């Protein structure tokens, strides 16, 4: 019934607005979906474990701030890392990607550890880490005399790497981060469906006791799922900072 309603809605919209079914509209929809696909892939693993992750948005915000700090232009008067020399664009981008993955992975590891070790519900654990992560964000925005101001002035190499035009179809541009989102989706599909870790994840999500009896390391699996989710949030933060060209505390 839901699919029928969706089809009816799409057909009605096309009839009432002929611009809905256009390359421009399709490119906009694809770009919007791709910009949030990494965070969805991360939370997907947590949902398979019959849990959730309320800290996802804040981790994206924190890692976006990390990306902005590392990739601000050197000529900015209020550059947070003003005392440090500007790295070559390629090296700075790689460093930012690694930094966001590490920061996101650490938060994810903390989530997974407390969920697995103390048998706490993910809702409670991730609510706590959400608040703690936001506190860290507020502190980060006070660094270098920034005084809580939005971080902008990002290097053009960074924004082009993420938001530059990958291809034009019918006059509508698709940015590079659409390709990155597809790569992440394929990678996560492979991990979930073609690896022992993925099979263990589904086993733990179905029945932890049965999985444990079958020889699955439940603790390790839960921690790894949340850590992987955190890494995906970090990559989403890297994309989001460049996509918006600015990062704020919200």
Describe the predicted segments one by one:
Residues 23-31, 83-94, 164-178, 247-250:
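Interfacial loop-to-helix junctions that mark the boundaries of transmembrane helices
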Residues 5-21, 49, 137-141, 188-196:
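Structural signal for alpha-helical transmembrane segments and their membrane-water exit/capping regions
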Residues 45, 69, 106-117, 140, ...:
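Membrane-interface helix caps of multi-pass small-molecule transporters
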């Amino acid at each position: 019934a839901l699919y029928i309603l969706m089809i009816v809605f799409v057909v009605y919209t096309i009839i009432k607005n002929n611009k809905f079914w256009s390359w421009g509209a399709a490119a906009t929809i694809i770009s919007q979906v791709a910009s949030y696909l990494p965070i969805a892939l991360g939370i997907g693993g947590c949902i398979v474990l019959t849990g959730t992750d309320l800290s996802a948005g804040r981790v994206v915000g924190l890692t976006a701030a990390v990306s902005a700090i590392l990739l601000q232009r050197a000529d900015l008067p209020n550059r947070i890392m003003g005392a440090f020399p500007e790295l070559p664009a390629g090296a700075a981008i790689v460093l930012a990607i690694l930094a966001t993955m590490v920061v996101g992975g650490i938060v994810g590891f903390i989530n997974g550890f407390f969920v697995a070790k103390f048998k706490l519900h993910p809702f409670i654990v991730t609510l706590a880490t959400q608040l703690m992560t936001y506190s860290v964000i507020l502190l980060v925005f006070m660094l270098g005399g920034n005084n809580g101001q939005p971080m902008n002035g990002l290097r053009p190499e960074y924004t082009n790497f993420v938001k530059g035009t990958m291809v034009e179809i019918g006059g509508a541009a698709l940015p590079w981060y659409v390709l990155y989102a597809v790569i992440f989706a394929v990678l996560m599909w492979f991990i979930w469906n073609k690896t022992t870790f993925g099979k263990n994840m589904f086993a733990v999500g179905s029945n932890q006791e049965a999985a444990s009896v079958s020889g699955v390391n439940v603790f390790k699996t839960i921690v790894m799922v949340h850590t992987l989710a955190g890494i995906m949030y970090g990559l989403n933060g890297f994309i989001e900072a460049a996509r918006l060209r600015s990062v704020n505390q919200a």
